[in-house]
Every structure is written in C-alpha cells, then in structure tokens.
C-alpha cells in the first residue's frame, strides 16, 4: 500500500480555470486522490499554520458513528446522516438530532473509543515533521472536543475547536454546549487563529 505526493508546476493562464478544476476534481474522485490548487507565489513556500479536520482525516473513522453503535442507535444515526447528505436537513439540525440519540451513554465509552482511535497512516510522522519545522497545528472539526483533545495531547497540537458534548453524572445528556462548529464556523476559527498567531491568511493551509 504505497502513498505518494506529486507536485506539478503549470505555467500560463488557463482559458477556463473553473472548468479545469472541475475536471481535476472529477479525476480526484474517480481515482481516490486529493488535489490542492495553489498559486506559485512567495506565500506558498512560507506556510505557518495548518488546520486539519479530524474524522476520516486524522482518524480513519467517524466518531459519532462509533458512539451511536455503542449506544445501540447506529441505524438511526446513519439514517439522519443520509437525510443530511440528500439536503433534506442542514448540518446543524442533523447534528442536534444525532447527538440527542446519544443520551444516557456512559462517559467511559468515550474514553474507550478515544484510546482506540484508528490513527490514519502517516499522521504521526506528519505531525512530527510539521512541529519540527515550526508549524502551528490546529484541529477544526464538526466532531467532538473530547476526541480532539485526546489527539491534541497525543501529538502536541496547538489548537482544537470542535463540538462539546454535555455530560452530567458521568453520562451524555443528548445535548451539546456552545456554538456548533460547522463549515462557516471553521472558516471563522481559521481567521481567528491566524490573527492570534499573527499569520497572514495566505500562509495557512
């Protein structure tokens, strides 16, 4: 199972940049590859802040699915996720509905899942290299702070912003605490961290 990264430098001005990107993204999906489009300027070689998603990125699972299975509501949570994927409900509504189904789950289950998270191949080495070169590293996730903080401690990361599950008497209440971290909130948090670290937004990944 070989993984590789290839950099292609293209000169000139595309006749239709958006169409070129669409075609490459289709190829990305067909071949299970990732593409990143970057302007070849001074900032490209001077990145200082890198932000990661967590579920199915740093870890090879969706934590809410793992929690749902342990709570005996796996099928119900999956059905809500599918409704959201079809656009029938938005992320925030689907998030609240799924979290509500976790009510009563013992916090010890979260601890067990955290200590057995399947870390994506190469992540440990990547974090070591990024820290060695002085990058600030953040997790911005629609997942849960409990697991984000576990990874923060494990790899020595700088920031974690995710959703906090409310816990009372050692059990989940089926509610969350604070603002939901969705796509819009992630963009706001990226800008916030960049300001705190005095990093130009062009120097972020």
Enumerate the predicted regions with their spans.
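Active-site neighborhood of HAD-like aspartate-dependent phosphohydrolases
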Residues: 42-92, 96-97
């Amino acid at each position: 199972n070989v993984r590789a990264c290839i950099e292609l430098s293209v000169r000139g001005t595309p006749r239709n940049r958006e169409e070129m990107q669409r075609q490459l993204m289709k190829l990305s999906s067909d071949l299970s590859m990732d593409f990143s489009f970057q302007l070849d300027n001074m900032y490209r070689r001077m990145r200082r802040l890198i932000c990661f998603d967590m579920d199915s990125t740093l870890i090879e699972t969706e934590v809410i699915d793992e929690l749902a299975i342990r709570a005996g509501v796996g099928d119900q949570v999956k059905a809500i996720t599918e409704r959201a994927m079809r656009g029938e409900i938005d992320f925030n509504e689907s998030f609240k509905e799924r979290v509500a189904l976790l009510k009563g789950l013992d916090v010890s289950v979260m601890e067990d899942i955290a200590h057995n998270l399947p870390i994506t191949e190469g992540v440990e080495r990547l974090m070591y290299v990024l820290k060695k070169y002085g990058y600030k590293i953040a997790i911005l996730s629609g997942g849960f702070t409990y697991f984000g903080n576990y990874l923060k401690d494990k790899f020595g990361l700088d920031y974690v912003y995710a959703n906090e599950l409310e816990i009372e008497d050692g059990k989940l209440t089926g509610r969350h605490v604070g603002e939901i971290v969705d796509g819009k909130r992630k963009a706001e948090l990226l800008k916030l961290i960049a300001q705190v670290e005095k990093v130009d937004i062009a120097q972020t990944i």
